[in-house]
């Protein structure tokens, strides 16, 4: 029987670190995490309180405050230095954080798919991550027929290879995964060897904006929650299309901001401010909408373009990640992992806030390359 998670007792005081003078959503955090007790909290524009669970928490807060970096504003017009800086940050973030994620959540580094309103355990969350893969395949009408199923698959932004190995087993397919993180690529390959898949699955460090594959190589092009890291969304999509074989299916599951109304030219200032804070910690360039992706696909004459907002189906995910981080195992692993991971953990409540305010959308976009 598995041991129950150990949460910090209610007497432990947890304050909210306020980066750039912005208050995290205390009410949403409390509603999701009843085991946590917040200290008396009176919002001001100048306080920079920190988690006070450890004696050195002030040092942690000072380091976090010092690490607040400018938002990456990369528009794809040749800002090579900024792109390199962004990609270096992404690689280092995942080099540092992938181990703790695997230890607590397993080898699938993405949201789960849940029935709305359900209460789920950690085991259910891992099942939900597999369901996310299956729901995306179903939405894209990927066939299980032995004569029609994909035989060559690329996993763009593969993490530690959870999806790639799943596809290799499900379809008996050859799978290639790419990531910016050397740590992820090495771990993904080690897991493939451990599962006896080294002959069909391989991983390498590569840039999704310049994939190391020839034209038209893959029957299924898969991108699970990597598009949000791409500084040039059009170039990213063009590369997905380039490596896709004629008739191939392309699946993009990604974070987007809400679609703009016909009268809007941009998000509201407070919405953009929220996203900027998330960008700072997760090494994200400027966000785009689902409609922006669709326009790119239409401009490239892709067929059977479909889109859906699955935000309601991923609602339990971020509260669950916060809960797992606040178990003794999760918290001590987090503290050991490094500053980039700690910084990322501190903005998790902003993801909850962004979804609740309908600023953030969890989007799935699929299409087919013409024959």
Swiss-Prot record:
UniProt keyword terms in alphabetical order: Alkaloid metabolism, Chloroplast, Membrane, Methyltransferase, Plastid, Plastid inner membrane, S-adenosyl-L-methionine, Transferase, Transit peptide
Keyword S-adenosyl-L-methionine annotated: yes
Region annotation SAM motif III: where it falls in the sequence: 243-252
EC number: 2.1.1.-
GO cellular component annotations of the record: chloroplast inner membrane
Chain segments annotated as transmembrane: none
Catalytic activity, reaction form: picrinine + S-adenosyl-L-methionine = ervincine + S-adenosyl-L-homocysteine + H(+)
Listed Pfam families: Methyltransf_11
Region called SAM motif II, residue ranges: 216-224
Compartments it resides in: Plastid, Chloroplast inner membrane
A single GO molecular function term of this UniProt record: S-adenosylmethionine-dependent methyltransferase activity
InterPro entries, A to Z: Methyltransf_11 (IPR013216), MTs_g-TMT (IPR025774), SAM-dependent_MTases_sf (IPR029063)
Enzyme class, broadest EC rank: transferase
Transit peptide: 1-65
UniProt-annotated stretches for the region SAM motif I: 153-162
GO biological process annotation, one example: methylation
Record pathway: Alkaloid biosynthesis; vindoline biosynthesis
Quaternary structure annotation from Swiss-Prot or TrEMBL: Homodimer.
Family: Belongs to the class I-like SAM-binding methyltransferase superfamily. gTMT family.
Function recorded in the entry: S-adenosyl-L-methionine-dependent N-methyltransferase involved in the biosynthesis of biologically active monoterpenoid indole alkaloids (MIAs) natural products including vindoline. Inactive with picrinine as substrate.
Protein name: Gamma-tocopherol methyltransferase, chloroplastic
Organism the protein comes from: Catharanthus roseus
């Amino acid at each position: 029987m598995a041991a129950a998670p150990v949460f910090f007792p209610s007497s432990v005081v947890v304050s909210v670190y306020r980066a750039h003078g912005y208050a995290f959503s205390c009410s949403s955090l409390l509603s999701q995490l009843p085991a946590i007790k917040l200290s008396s909290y009176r919002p001001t524009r100048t306080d920079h309180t920190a988690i006070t669970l450890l004696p050195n928490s002030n040092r942690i807060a000072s380091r976090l405050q010092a690490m607040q970096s400018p938002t990456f504003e990369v528009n794809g017009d040749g800002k090579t230095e900024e792109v390199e800086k962004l990609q270096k940050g992404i690689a280092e973030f995942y080099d540092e954080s992938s181990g703790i994620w695997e230890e607590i959540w397993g080898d699938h580094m993405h949201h789960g798919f849940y029935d709305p309103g359900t209460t789920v355990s950690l085991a259910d969350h891992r099942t939900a991550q597999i369901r996310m893969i299956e729901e995306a395949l179903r939405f894209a009408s990927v066939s299980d027929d032995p004569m029609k199923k994909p035989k060559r698959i690329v996993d763009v932004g593969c993490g530690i290879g959870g999806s790639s190995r799943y596809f290799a087993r499900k379809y008996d397919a050859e799978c290639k995964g790419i990531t910016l993180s050397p740590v992820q690529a090495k771990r993904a390959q080690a897991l493939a060897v451990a599962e006896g898949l080294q002959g069909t699955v391989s991983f390498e460090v590569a840039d999704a904006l310049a994939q190391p594959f020839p034209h038209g190589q893959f029957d299924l092009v898969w991108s699970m929650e990597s598009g949000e890291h791409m500084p040039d969304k059009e170039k990213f999509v063009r590369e997905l299309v380039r490596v896709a074989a004629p008739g191939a299916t392309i699946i993009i599951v990604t974070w987007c901001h809400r679609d703009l109304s016909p009268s809007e030219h941009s998000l509201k200032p407070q919405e953009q401010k929220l996203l900027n804070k998330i960008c700072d910690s997760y090494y994200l360039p400027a966000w785009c909408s689902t409609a922006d992706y669709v326009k790119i696909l239409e401009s490239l004459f892709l067929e059977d373009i479909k889109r859906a907002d699955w935000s309601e189906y991923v609602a339990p995910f971020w509260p669950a990640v916060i809960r797992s981080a606040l178990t003794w195992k999760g918290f001590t692993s987090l503290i050991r992992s490094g500053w980039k991971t700690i910084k990322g953990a501190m903005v998790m409540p902003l993801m909850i806030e962004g979804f609740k305010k309908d600023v953030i959308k969890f989007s799935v976009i699929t299409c087919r390359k013409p024959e």
